[in-house]
Amino acid sequence: MQTALYISVLIISSCGLVYELLAGTIASYLLGETVTQFSLIIGTYLFSMGVGSWLSKYLEKDLIPKFLEIELAIGLVGGFSSAILYLSFGQIRYFQIPLFLLVILIGILVGLEIPVLLRILKKELQFKELVSRVLSLDYVGALLASILFPIFFAPKLGLMRTGFIFGILNVGVALWGTWVLPLRQSKIIILRAQSVVVLTLLILGFSYSDLITYYSEESLYTDEIILSKQTQYQRIIVTRWKNEIRLFLNGHLQFSSRDEYRYHETLVHPALLAHPAPKKVLVLGGGDGLAVREILKHKNVESVTLVDLDSAITNLFSEHGILKELNEESLKNSKVTVINTDAFLWLEESDQTFDVVLIDFPDPSNFSLGKLYTTAFFHTLKRRMNETSVLEIQSTSPLFARSSYWCIERTIASLGFYTLPLHVYVPSFGEWGFVLAGQRPIQFKKKFPKDLKFLNIQELESIQTFPQDMSRVPVEINRLDNQALVRYYDREWNRILD
């Protein structure tokens, strides 16, 4: 019996942590503010476990069958938790209600497990030996789950299937327990029947995960979903309405094929026109290849290095028929080198210098993204530039996130760069901002590449003029130790979305 229960501890501790990680990950995907969501969920989950541990004192008789019933309950609720959360988001206005109800319920049930197990085993071992073995196995199981969840389960199976898999493991513990633990025959029959029912539901859920995911995402997106993919880093959704293609990462619109040319022409061409003879170009982010498409319109460019964290994005936009058509197969051009790694780390390790650096990172909605807009990042980037090099970075909306925009501009200027703020109206986004910078005052060449749809000499002048409601405001410099930009961004966009 001891061995069976020790193995159970290892499994159930892994399951308990995975349910917590699932809730935190889904909340951060759907609601943003990763640090806030994980902090609230972890705190609520741990508190609920404490409540469960306290409630365990009221379980006095038939502890073994009660332990197995707890496992069935956790398997059912935890296994379906991802599906419930995805389906709730599109249907319930206050998504936080089902989110925290599930976290509390799972936390209470998980909190019951270890105290009940300790009481079952108390006659088998000395107390100090019992506690050390059970708790050490509990922590080992949590470690295994924390390693395997981001490396294997989430990217390979997706969040919904991962939930069902660990629910099946919980039920497997209960079903296995009916054979290896001492139980009355009447209890064995009941528990096995319950286990089979719950197991069947979870297997059906696993089998129909794609359908559940499709239905839940269809309720979130008005257009037809033509591609849905979970990677190690993000959820990728591509939608289509007539001839319009849209890319969403973690629920956030990245571009619409109807008007992305306005964004990408403004991101790319001012920087290339500000350099006397750009030959080596570095693109950080921009794995969709749309910025690279614009760069290749400058025939004097000899090489383009694209550094993007997620290989799934660059692979999709290299291989998928519709997507590679959008970027005109730019990622397969012989001038282009694609590197899939962390941009910050790559800059620190590289010894190359570039004439033009274009930065197309996601908005600074969390601290891991916010670090890419800090003085530390731009200081590292500066070492990859020479005296004539220029950089341009997308800088969120100067209208909707005014402080965020000027925080990025001031942070770059604080390192000795001459800056030129730019903005453009993109119908899909509204007003959008960029910052062009160099170690010399910015001067533009007059010769534009052919085939531009938006940018010309007149527009280049107009995008430098900011109306009063987008003009400069006092802001802090964004540093690693203050992450002021993330605070500005959260406050401003939450105000708009609310």
Swiss-Prot record:
<feature type="binding site">
    <location>
        <position position="264"/>
    </location>
    <ligand>
        <name>spermidine</name>
    </ligand>
</feature>
<dbReference type="Pfam" id="PF01564">
    <property type="entry name" value="Spermine_synth"/>
</dbReference>
<dbReference type="GO" id="GO:0004766">
    <property type="term" value="F:spermidine synthase activity"/>
</dbReference>
<feature type="transmembrane region" description="Helical">
    <location>
        <begin position="7"/>
        <end position="27"/>
    </location>
</feature>
<dbReference type="InterPro" id="IPR030373">
    <property type="entry name" value="PABS_CS"/>
</dbReference>
<feature type="transmembrane region" description="Helical">
    <location>
        <begin position="134"/>
        <end position="154"/>
    </location>
</feature>
<feature type="active site" description="Proton acceptor">
    <location>
        <position position="360"/>
    </location>
</feature>
<feature type="transmembrane region" description="Helical">
    <location>
        <begin position="97"/>
        <end position="117"/>
    </location>
</feature>
<feature type="binding site">
    <location>
        <position position="288"/>
    </location>
    <ligand>
        <name>spermidine</name>
    </ligand>
</feature>
<dbReference type="GO" id="GO:0006596">
    <property type="term" value="P:polyamine biosynthetic process"/>
</dbReference>
<dbReference type="InterPro" id="IPR030374">
    <property type="entry name" value="PABS"/>
</dbReference>
<feature type="transmembrane region" description="Helical">
    <location>
        <begin position="35"/>
        <end position="55"/>
    </location>
</feature>
<dbReference type="InterPro" id="IPR029063">
    <property type="entry name" value="SAM-dependent_MTases_sf"/>
</dbReference>
<keyword id="KW-0808">Transferase</keyword>
<keyword id="KW-1003">Cell membrane</keyword>
<comment type="similarity">
    <text>Belongs to the spermidine/spermine synthase family.</text>
</comment>
<feature type="transmembrane region" description="Helical">
    <location>
        <begin position="67"/>
        <end position="87"/>
    </location>
</feature>
<feature type="domain" description="PABS">
    <location>
        <begin position="200"/>
        <end position="439"/>
    </location>
</feature>
<keyword id="KW-0745">Spermidine biosynthesis</keyword>
<keyword id="KW-0472">Membrane</keyword>
<comment type="pathway">
    <text>Amine and polyamine biosynthesis; spermidine biosynthesis; spermidine from putrescine: step 1/1.</text>
</comment>
<dbReference type="InterPro" id="IPR001045">
    <property type="entry name" value="Spermi_synthase"/>
</dbReference>
<feature type="binding site">
    <location>
        <begin position="342"/>
        <end position="343"/>
    </location>
    <ligand>
        <name>S-methyl-5'-thioadenosine</name>
    </ligand>
</feature>
<dbReference type="GO" id="GO:0010487">
    <property type="term" value="F:thermospermine synthase activity"/>
</dbReference>
<feature type="binding site">
    <location>
        <position position="234"/>
    </location>
    <ligand>
        <name>S-methyl-5'-thioadenosine</name>
    </ligand>
</feature>
<dbReference type="GO" id="GO:0005886">
    <property type="term" value="C:plasma membrane"/>
</dbReference>
<keyword id="KW-0620">Polyamine biosynthesis</keyword>
<comment type="subunit">
    <text>Homodimer or homotetramer.</text>
</comment>
<dbReference type="GO" id="GO:0008295">
    <property type="term" value="P:spermidine biosynthetic process"/>
</dbReference>
<keyword id="KW-1133">Transmembrane helix</keyword>
<protein>
    <recommendedName>
        <fullName>Polyamine aminopropyltransferase 1</fullName>
        <ecNumber>2.5.1.16</ecNumber>
    </recommendedName>
</protein>
<feature type="region of interest" description="Spermidine synthase">
    <location>
        <begin position="196"/>
        <end position="446"/>
    </location>
</feature>
<comment type="function">
    <text>Catalyzes the irreversible transfer of a propylamine group from the amino donor S-adenosylmethioninamine (decarboxy-AdoMet) to putrescine (1,4-diaminobutane) to yield spermidine.</text>
</comment>
<keyword id="KW-0812">Transmembrane</keyword>
<feature type="transmembrane region" description="Helical">
    <location>
        <begin position="163"/>
        <end position="183"/>
    </location>
</feature>
<feature type="binding site">
    <location>
        <position position="308"/>
    </location>
    <ligand>
        <name>S-methyl-5'-thioadenosine</name>
    </ligand>
</feature>
